[in-house]
From Swiss-Prot:
Protein name, UniProt field: Dihydroxy-acid dehydratase
Family annotation (Pfam families): ILV_EDD_C, ILVD_EDD_N
Keyword vocabulary terms for this entry: 2Fe-2S, Amino-acid biosynthesis, Branched-chain amino acid biosynthesis, Iron, Iron-sulfur, Lyase, Magnesium, Metal-binding
A single GO cellular-component term on record: cytosol
Lineage summary: Bacteria, Pseudomonadati, Pseudomonadota, Gammaproteobacteria, Moraxellales
Species: Acinetobacter baumannii (strain ATCC 17978 / DSM 105126 / CIP 53.77 / LMG 1025 / NCDC KC755 / 5377)
């Protein structure tokens, strides 16, 4: 039977000094021998998805104490991708994921914590904490801050639901007045919480449900609803139970690596494809699997994408549907329930809250349960009042959305499409693969052939788009924006949004070794691997080259002969793999260190050891 890790610093005469310090934090004689639970918070006033988390760590801590544990809270950093977007701040977003993972490891191992509750929410925070959980392999429960409510705007006689991306698109569209743009801006993000669509933050919080590491509703119930408080209270109680099961009953089945097995990662990716999640989730699942020492690769993702249907379309794929609508339809447990009925899941895998995923679905899938409390939970609705306060309203929808033919969540028979919302493409421009969010691509351009317009940075591409230099039929190629080349693998939300603003959302493609925001849609192909800085063929594309994209057949092809491609490679290798034009970009020492040690997107942009 394993000893409590905390015993290292709480027992023995040689630890008198450490115990003295523990006492100075409030511990008493009776606390030594109890499990020490790290409450890993990520409160910050910089990020709307985290601004309401300040007191929630202590809410969880109180439940831990009441359940017989000792709670000790610390904070991680949290970068807001939306605020960091469109300037050099975005260089820091992806590297912050690894910094968060390291900081959690440092704090938990330095202080010998026995277990942890991870309070996350936005884009890189959940992945960073997930990587740390897999690395540490101690009992853990994830609980996120929750989605913000969708914005509402009365525009030219109609009321519509909007989000951050809508504000960005109209801001670059000259047909809107300054007053109209300001109204979108004021209305887009009305409450605390992660941005309201199926963007990266919400995608990752949904995936923790599928991985079995968080409670039902974690990914979907809005941050403002009183029922979300129940998740935090339950997390505090549950983590003490899990810690005692492992350390006092020798039950290793509740450890993260026992729960997040390859089968669980495949379940999570199956969910991701079915709900049209952010392409960033591919990076993060690959990275988490790497930490868990699970053999989960791009090939697994490719195989799943060919047979998993799209069962839900949420903004940005369907602009009038947001996470609050997914919750009303039964949340993630409902999507998993439909996938189970289509025989696309392994429901024998365990979770932190039920013995198996099957047991969880029997209890929480609104189609199969008869529990009125579950029905009420999923009727939790937005409050419609701007606020930065968690759990501040208690409104309910009058009915659930159980329509599986035309509703927000469909069954497999009535799927939006028969193959997945994410796809892996291969070809001579992406030998190790690239990713496209097919759920956000119009059917008319699933096959697309166009002429390359090559840019050595996101900034240059944005300037060309806003300057009306991009025309229908162009393939915008943005390179040297990968994990090494950026460095930091910037998101390309501005270029995709501006293409929409110019009316080119269905007439152009964008191909990059960078990545896309979860808010991006359109024919946006990212994570091209190998990246240009690694000698990838994207670094050999020239203006005017023809690029053929065939999503149904999962191919992307630079239409030049092998001899020409080989000649270009010889010339480029002599010059070195770097942008042809000098970029106005300040790369700090921290970013240079990141660039030296990161791998390609095809491997999750994890570090080389």
């Amino acid at each position: 039977m394993p000893d409590y890790r905390s015993k290292t610093s709480t027992h023995g005469r040689n630890m008198a000094g450490a115990r003295g310090l523990w006492r100075a934090t409030g511990m008493k004689d009776e606390d030594f021998g109890k499990p020490i639970i790290a409450v890993v918070n990520s409160f910050t006033q910089f990020v709307p998805g985290h601004v309401h988390l300040k007191d929630l760590g202590q809410l969880v801590a109180a439940e831990i104490q009441a359940a017989g544990g000792v709670a000790k809270e610390f904070n991680t950093i949290a970068v807001d991708d939306g605020i960091a977007m469109g300037h050099d701040g975005m260089l820091y977003s992806l590297p912050s994921r690894d910094l968060i993972a390291d900081s959690v490891e440092y704090m938990v191992n330095a202080h010998c914590a026995d277990a942890m509750v991870c309070i996350s929410n936005c884009d890189k925070i959940t992945p960073g904490m997930l990587m740390a959980a897999m690395r540490l392999n101690i009992p853990v429960v994830f609980v996120s801050g929750g989605p913000m409510e969708a914005g509402k705007v009365k525009f030219r006689g109609d009321e519509k639901a909007i989000d951050l991306v809508d504000a960005m698109v109209v801001a670059a569209d000259d047909s809107y007045t300054d007053e109209e743009v300001a109204e979108f801006e004021r209305s887009a993000c009305p409450t605390c919480g992660s941005c309201s669509g199926m963007f990266t933050a919400n995608s990752m919080n949904c995936l923790t449900e599928a991985l079995g590491l968080s409670l039902p509703g974690n990914g979907s119930i809005v941050a403002t609803h009183a029922n979300r408080k129940k998740l935090f209270l339950k997390a505090g109680q549950l983590i003490v139970e899990l810690a005692k099961r492992y350390y006092e009953q020798n039950d290793a089945s509740i450890l993260p690596r026992s729960i997040a097995t390859k089968a669980a990662f495949k379940n999570a990716m199956t969910l991701d494809i079915a709900m049209g999640g952010s392409t960033n989730t591919v990076l993060h699942l690959l990275a988490a699997a790497n930490e868990a020492e699970v053999d989960f690769t791009m090939d697994d993702i490719d195989e799943l994408s060919r047979r998993v249907p799209v069962l839900s379309k949420v903004a940005p794929a369907k602009q009038d549907v947001h996470m609050e609508d997914v919750h009303r339809a039964g949340g993630i447990m409902a999507i998993l329930g439909e996938l189970d009925r289509a025989n696309l899941l392994d429901v024998s895998v365990p979770t932190v809250h039920e013995k198996t995923l099957k047991d969880a679905l029997d209890k929480w899938d609104i189609i199969r349960t008869e529990d009125p409390d579950v029905y009420e939970f999923y009727r939790s609705s937005p409050g419609g009042v701007p606020t930065q306060v968690a759990f501040s309203q208690n409104r309910y929808y009058s009915t659930l959305d159980g329509d599986r033919e035309k509703g927000v969540i469909r069954n497999a028979e009535h799927a939006f499409s028969k193959d997945g919302g994410l796809a892996v493409l291969y070809g001579n421009i992406a030998l190790d693969g690239c990713i496209v969010k097919t759920a956000g691509v119009d059917e008319s351009i699933l096959k697309f052939t166009g002429s390359a317009r090559v840019f050595e940075s996101q900034d240059a591409a944005v300037e060309a788009i806003l300057g009306n230099e991009i025309k229908a039929g162009d393939v915008v190629v943005i390179r040297y924006e990968g994990p090494r080349g950026g460095p930091g693998m910037q998101e390309m939300l501005y270029p995709t949004s501006y293409l929409k603003s110019k009316g080119l959302g269905k007439d152009c493609a964008l191909v990059t070794d960078g990545r896309f925001s979860g808010g991006s849609s359109g024919l946006s192909i990212g994570h091209v691997s190998p990246e240009a800085a690694e000698g990838g063929a994207i670094g050999l594309v020239e203006d005017g080259d023809t690029i053929e994209i065939d999503i149904p057949n999962r191919t992307i092809h630079l239409n030049i002969d092998d001899a020409t491609l080989a000649h270009r490679r010889t010339v480029q290798e002599a010059k070195g793999w770097h942008p042809k034009e000098e970029r106005k970009r300040k790369v700090s020492k921290a970013l240079k260190v990141y660039a030296m040690h990161t791998t390609s997107a095809a491997k999750g942009a994890v570090r080389i050891l």
